[in-house]
Amino acid sequence: LFYGGFFDALLYPITQLSPLLLHDTRHLCNAFIGLLGIVATYRLGACLGSPTTGLLSALFLVLTPRFFGHTFNNPKDIPFATFYIWSIYYLVQGLKFLLTLSKKQIWQIGIAIGLALATRVGGVILFFYLGIFYGLVYLWMLQDRDRPAHIIRGFLIQGIGIFAIAYI
């Protein structure tokens, strides 16, 4: 009901090809996804602050016993947390270029949100974050520009593109 089958579907062919035992392969893949979450945390911290901030963010995440313990054993929450943090990272990174997002950035945001949504239904909240980010930037841009129709059209095109990519 609350969990998507993406991670299990991803693991099935890997477990068929791996020479390791089924559970060992699943734990190894889960740990790799957890490592990607740590990398995403570093990048988000570096994007919001400095490389030192990113390093401290990643270090604090690694030193959190619950995250570290679940990294090897939780095939639902760790992939969701990883894809969620990647989504937040790409959303924050995209705030700098929100009206002029490149196709690559639209794909990155859409894929990250789509993976979070495919892992757990809680990923739907990322669409609300996207809407809040667009709304706040829209209000900020209205102070400097007198062409709200141009801004709304750009936001709608980007938002529909991100939604379509995430849906696929």
What are these regions (language model features)?
Residues F2-P19, A31-F32:
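Short hydrophobic/aromatic helix or loop-helix immediately within or flanking a transmembrane segment
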Residues R26-I33, S57, K76, I113-L117, ...:
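Alpha-helical transmembrane segments of multi-pass integral membrane proteins
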Residues L28-L36, L63, I78-W86, F127-F128, ...:
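Membrane-embedded alpha-helical segments of multi-pass membrane proteins
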Residues L28-L48, T52, W86-Y90:
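Transmembrane-helix motifs of polytopic, lipid-linked glycan transferases
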Residues A40, P79-L99, A112:
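Specific aromatic-rich, kink-prone transmembrane helix
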Residues S57-V62, G69, I85, Y89, ...:
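Short helix- or helix-capping micro-motifs
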Residues R66, F72-P79:
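Short acidic/glycine- and proline-prone juxtamembrane loop motifs at membrane-interface regions
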Residues Q93-K104, L126-F163:
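Perimembrane helix-loop-helix junctions
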